C-alpha cells in the first residue's frame, strides 16, 4: 500500500518533468565548440538489411527524431512526412529512431513497428516517407552512440528532468532526452545546430528550420 501511494503522489512530478515543459524553452541552439560530427556514427535500418554510415548525409540538413508508435505524440508522424516532403528541396532529411524508454510506448519488435504505424497509430494506412532505424536506447548505459554525441552537443531546452522513480535508465544525465519525439537538427557539415523539446509543434520546428536555412545561405 505504501508503495502504491508513493507512486500515486510521484506521478504528477513525473508528468511535470516529462510532458509539461511550457515553463521552459521550446528549442535551444547547440554548443559552438562541438568536437566531431555525425559522420563518425552509423546505424542499421529498421529491417536490419542495411547498415547506413551517416557520412552518406554529408551536405544535407538532417533532423534526428526519437519516435514511438503508441504515444500521444504519434500524430507527429504524418506531420514529419509533410515536413520531409516540403523541405526536401532545401536539403532536409528526416531520420527516425524508435525507442521504448518513455512509457514503454514502442513495445514491438522491429518487424512489427511499420504494421503498428499503418494499422493502429496513426493508422489509416500510414507509411513513413523517411528512414526509420532499428529500435534502441537514446539514454543510459546502452544508448546509441550517435545520441550520446547529439545530447552532449546540445543543452536541453527544459530544466526539468522528472521523477527519478519513473526513470528506467542509468546513469541519468542532465542532457538526457525527456520523452518521445525530441528533435535535433544537424547542419550540412555534420555538426548539430539546434534541439527541440518533444511537444514543440512541427509547424514551429519547420519555421525554425526555414529561419536557419535563410541565415545559413547568407553566411
Curated annotation (Swiss-Prot):
Protein name: Epididymal secretory glutathione peroxidase
Reactions the enzyme catalyzes: 2 glutathione + H2O2 = glutathione disulfide + 2 H2O
Expression sites by tissue: Proximal caput epididymis.
Gene coding for it: GPX5
GO BP annotations listed: response to oxidative stress
Gene3D superfamilies cross-referenced by the UniProt entry: Glutaredoxin (3.40.30.10)
Annotated organism of origin: Sus scrofa
Active site: 71
Annotated function: May constitute a glutathione peroxidase-like protective system against peroxide damage in sperm membrane lipids. Since the purified porcine enzyme has very little activity towards hydrogen peroxide or organic hydroperoxides the protective effect is not likely to be exerted by its enzymatic activity. Instead, may protect sperm from premature acrosome reaction in the epididymis by binding to lipid peroxides, which might otherwise interact with phospholipase A2 and induce the acrosome reaction.
Similarity section: Belongs to the glutathione peroxidase family.
Record PANTHER family: EPIDIDYMAL SECRETORY GLUTATHIONE PEROXIDASE (PTHR11592:SF127), GLUTATHIONE PEROXIDASE (PTHR11592)
Keywords, in A-Z order: Oxidoreductase, Peroxidase, Secreted, Signal
Assembly: Homotetramer.
Keyword Oxidoreductase: yes
Signal peptide (residue range): 1-21
Enzyme class, UniProt record, top EC level: oxidoreductase
EC number(s) given by UniProt: 1.11.1.9
Localization in the cell: Secreted
Pfam family, one: GSHPx
Chief localisation class: secreted
An example Gene Ontology molecular-function term: glutathione peroxidase activity
This protein's GO CC annotations: extracellular region
Entry superkingdom: Eukaryota
Amino acid at each position: 500500500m505504501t508503495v502504491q501511494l508513493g507512486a500515486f503522489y510521484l506521478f504528477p512530478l513525473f508528468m511535470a518533468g516529462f510532458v509539461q515543459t511550457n515553463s521552459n524553452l521550446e528549442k535551444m541552439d547547440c554548443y559552438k565548440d562541438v568536437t566531431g560530427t555525425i559522420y563518425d556514427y552509423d546505424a542499421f535500418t529498421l529491417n536490419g538489411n542495411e547498415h547506413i554510415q551517416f557520412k552518406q548525409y554529408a551536405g544535407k540538413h538532417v533532423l534526428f527524431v526519437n519516435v514511438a508508435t503508441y504515444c500521444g505524440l504519434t500524430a507527429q508522424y504524418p506531420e514529419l512526412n509533410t515536413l520531409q516532403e516540403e523541405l526536401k528541396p532545401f536539403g532536409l532529411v528526416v531520420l527516425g529512431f524508435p525507442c521504448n524508454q518513455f512509457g514503454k510506448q514502442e513495445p514491438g519488435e522491429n518487424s512489427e513497428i511499420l504494421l503498428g504505424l499503418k494499422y493502429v497509430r496513426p493508422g489509416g494506412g500510414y507509411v513513413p516517407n523517411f528512414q526509420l532505424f532499428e529500435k534502441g536506447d537514446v539514454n543510459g548505459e546502452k544508448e546509441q552512440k550517435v545520441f550520446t554525441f547529439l545530447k552532449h552537443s546540445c543543452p536541453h531546452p527544459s530544466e526539468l528532468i522528472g521523477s527519478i522513480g519513473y526513470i528506467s535508465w542509468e546513469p541519468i544525465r542532465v542532457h538526457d532526452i525527456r520523452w518521445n519525439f525530441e528533435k535535433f537538427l544537424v547542419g550540412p557539415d555534420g555538426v548539430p545546430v539546434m534541439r527541440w523539446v518533444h511537444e514543440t509543434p512541427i509547424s514551429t520546428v519547420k519555421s525554425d528550420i526555414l529561419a536557419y536555412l535563410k541565415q545559413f545561405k547568407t553566411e
